[in-house]
Amino acid sequence: VAVVGAGGTGAYYGGALARAGADVTMIARGPHLEAINKNGLQLNSVLLGDFLVECAATDDMSSVGRVDLVIFAVKSWGTDAAIEAMASGDMVGDGTMIISTQNGIDSEPLLSKAFGSEHVLGSTATVSAMITEPGVVNQAGGPGSLVIGEMSGGSSGRVTSLVERCVAAGIAAEADENINMALWMKFTFICALSGMTALTRKPIGDIFAQETTTEMYLQVLSEVAAVARAEGVPISQEMVDATLKTTQGREPFIIGSMGHDLIAGNPIEIGLLNARVVEMGKQHNIPTPANFAIEAALRPHEDGA
């Protein structure tokens, strides 16, 4: 297994598999890479417990060789460079499966274009995990789920077996025969969560404590769903309302990944999330004022502080 981008999310899933005995190589860089090589990866998780796992780590993808599974977990601004390095590193062989934990709806098409659609499974990862210091990842929120499916729909032996391996490692994994719907539902959820927590620089508890921000949160969700329907994905208003209700029941301290990146002064994924909704809305003549407001406020921060 190769984890391309061993930040919070990649390290959580890769660390769980490594603890269960999988041969995992973490692709990381800088002090985080040095710390993993020196001390191992320390994962502190409310779901999996706290543990230290020894695993290979490198910043050179050409040294990894062929793998059975790639977990593609880089931030969106690193996608093109990571795909290029993967391609030159000969990591993808005949039977290699690639799953992406990235936010957004664009990584599966990009990976399919680079490596062939037969290698790419659809997947959605829902976990709140972050690097708190080099070599240390904390997972404090989110269900830690991983939903996997064939992009063409239906079931397959490779999806079933991958899900079984993940479940055996303690990951809340499941197969989905309509993964495209799952990808769009996650996109809808994350545009609101990340967009609104970045816009307000506040966790969801503070957002839902105010009528105005709750109303805007729902508007973001509804706009994404309208765009999804225009793209042929039937997300109903009932599903939107259920998503809002579920989010309101989550831990009040949760901040979306874009909110964390903004607060830390890192580049943010606005182009992949709310701005993408605005772009698709224009294509379909669907107004997206709430997503546009988020894009307008956050574009100046796109490249970090």
Language-model segment annotations:
Residues L218-A305:
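NAD(P)-dependent Rossmann-like dehydrogenase/reductase catalytic/cofactor-binding core
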Residues G15, R19, E84-S88, K113, ...:
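Short, well-ordered alpha-helices that flank and scaffold nucleotide-derived cofactor binding pockets
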Residues D50-V136:
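Rossmann-like NAD(P)(H) cofactor-binding subdomain of soluble oxidoreductases
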Residues V1-V46:
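NAD(P)+-binding Rossmann beta1-loop-alpha1 motif at the extreme N-terminus of oxidoreductases
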Residues G89-G93, A114-H119, P134-K186, C191, ...:
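Internal alpha-helical scaffold of NAD(P)-dependent oxidoreductase catalytic cores
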Residues L41-A57, I190:
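N-terminal glycine-rich dinucleotide-binding loop that anchors FAD/FMN and/or NAD(P) in oxidoreductases
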